Amino acid sequence: MPVADRPLASRGKYAEIVEKLSANFKEIPPQEMKGNELLRILEDTLSYVPSSTAKGEVCDISLFDHVKITAAVASSLLRYMQQHGIADYKNFCCTRGLENRKKDTLLFISADFSGIQKFIYRVQTKGAMRMLRGRSFYLAMVMEHIIDEILEKLSLSRANLIYSGGGHFYMMADN
């Protein structure tokens, strides 16, 4: 769960969160939004809300992360079923769920930009700090460009990007 200066949402804050979501959805209804636009609103609103409020459970996953992973799995499974001509989603997921879990329905895509440390730290001492920040920013932008290209080529949304940082990224897609 992200660490921030502001505390986790308390019971008194939930009405405020619902109001913020309602205000966003009055401007543009969710069914008219692009997936990435809806994802951004949910990230802004739910990143500091725990996914579980059950007593005795550790609140270590945000509601946003829970929703995002659920969307990645659901969209990947839907695409898999559509591409394999499976029309009875309930039968595939529920009735024959245990049997179908053994199938390779999901594909995890991983990338590692090796050698980035050499690139970042190969600087002269004069102005080194500015160069380090500049090179780090450049690599982050290159990585984001590559991620966006892959997502676009595979017709995936940002929900399918599970993690990116430190020269690595992981995505989920249909197999």
Annotated model-derived regions:
Residues 1-175:
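Regulatory and interdomain segments flanking nucleotide-handling catalytic cores
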